[in-house]
Amino acid sequence: MVTGIALVTVERKMLRQATDALLKIQGVTEVYTVAGEYDLVVMIRVTSNSELSDVVANKMTHDIPGIIHTRTMISLQADAKVDLCQFYDSSKHSEPKVFA
């Protein structure tokens, strides 16, 4: 599994629409609204670097109105309390979950 962390700047009036659109992209597992230099942190979990590139370069920046800028990092190692590959198995989590 390849994990990308995208820091995203969004037009303020488009924040909710951008968040909803991002959650519909295959491979996007979480979207966090944050304070600071960026507006959103987007977690992307895919099977290859080329798939990550497609999500960031095409689906995020070209297909979603309101996104001004992205900066993407690739995780070199993940340490977690759960098996992330099993947790994010697409067959088990096909629809985005919203937690209040």
Map each language-model feature to its residues:
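A compositional/biophysical signature of low hydrophobicity enriched in polar/charged and small residues
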Residues: 1-100
